[in-house]
């Protein structure tokens, strides 16, 4: 019996109509719309044979009597439909009144629910409810025809459980409030049937669903030959609503209950509800009233409203006396205008009689004041509705603005976090590059020191070798074994030095590859403009290197080539020898010449070794320093580009 998803009933904005529509669907499901009060009386009389109001019924008894009821109302109804209706109604009654799951319910509660959900007229239901409450009172013979407070409270508590089955009981208030409103102004211990019927016709809040359910059931098959102003449906089936503010504007039941807006009509306008198709006289009177309301000047309109207020006050009791359902329409937002329309359609003769009283000045003055007060109240209510609508629109706009601002704030926070992470990554790369640069500088300094030590040791070895050669040139001092061992040690030292140079070159090559890899990683996270700047920088450096190489190829030979050429040229040696050769050739100075020649050879070897060692060291140092400067320039350019892009 979950009615939340039936026919989209939760889309109905007005809680009273939403509850009534759900109860109407439940009524059709249980086939109670086919049951009349005359069909209920034999079954109820059988159950009330004991005369006690606290009779408890088990589920089997209730199901048995309900099956007899449904078989009696429609003999041609299939057995399957009878069984289904019996089961649905039994489950409904026990869901309403057996909250503790005891397995039994009271007879009075069953009778109240069946009377409220049957398909009889509203006046017949009201009289049946009065007789049921009268049976609760247990009055003496002299008190027949009235009900007490306790009896009315019990009846209203049972009836208040009916909308609870569709989760709408929170809308209609409490039973004690309804009892107080019924006994308001009553000095006796009970109320009569006339007063009770009048109170029910005034539609107390607790029983609003009862009259609304009846109007919906009456108007289901009614077709109104007018167009809906909102959805353009023709004809309008069901309840029809005519706007009292807009001229010739009609709404169907669906558009009104969902508060559908249109270009001219607003949900805040006062409307009249029609259950059945009105006659042509009623239509003409309604059209004239709308035209007068829209076209008559302000002072004439005020006079017309005053007269209509007088007519409404005089014909308040005649609104519910007509048995024709066409006269049972009520105002939704403006009670006084609805009463005026009802009085015009119900008793036009009474209007003529009451209009004669306007000739009396003594009655006219208080009535005019009453009409003005009523008009002020209606204007105030309209202003309050407009303010509430403006408040609702402002709240909607504020919600939209807050969502937009929140989304923008979130996007900015995401961008800020991305920039922060990028800056942290770049700082880490920069620190890593600086560490590698320091490592390169340290290795260069160590290598320079090693080269200085090596050159110094080579110089010392050469000097030792020159001494050995001098000793070798002297007669009687030749030591072949010592000279060969010295040469062997020199070769081993040279080999170790070359291996150390190769290891250091491999280390420098690995460091350069790490630097290039880090630069590539850092370039992958840079923006497009930084990549472009670095590419341009690399192209310029490559062009400069190519131009330098081209100039070196076309220019003069390098120092190494000149040195190699001088070494290979015998004239260089002979020139040097000629500088130190003696002018005379005597036999006495033959030993001196030989010693001078050895010294010259030793000096030449020392000079050549120093020149070669210093030249190679200077060349390698220059190459490493050039590479280090290039790395430094690239790192500084990278950091500058990142800072400029982050600031932009």
Swiss-Prot record:
GO terms for biological process: synaptic signaling. One of its GO terms (molecular function) is zinc ion binding. One of its GO terms (cellular component) is synapse. This is Dystrotelin. Zn(2+) 2 binds at residues 243, 246, 265, 269. InterPro entries: EF-hand-dom_pair, EF-hand_dom_typ1, EF-hand_dom_typ2, KCMF1/Dystrophin, Znf_ZZ, Znf_ZZ_sf. Residues 538-548 have a biased composition (Acidic residues). Residues 455-474 have a biased composition (Polar residues). Signal peptide: none annotated. Residues 455-509, 536-557 are annotated as: Disordered. Keywords: Cell membrane, Coiled coil, Membrane, Metal-binding, Zinc, Zinc-finger. Gene3D superfamilies: 3.30.60.90, 6.10.140.70, EF-hand. It comes from Danio rerio. A zinc finger (ZZ-type) spans 223-279. It is found in: Cell membrane. Zn(2+) 1 binds at residues 228, 231, 252, 255. It comes from the Eukaryota. Residues 367-446 form a coiled coil. Disulfide bonds: none annotated. Pfam families: EF-hand_2, EF-hand_3, ZZ. Residues 479-502 have a biased composition (Basic and acidic residues).
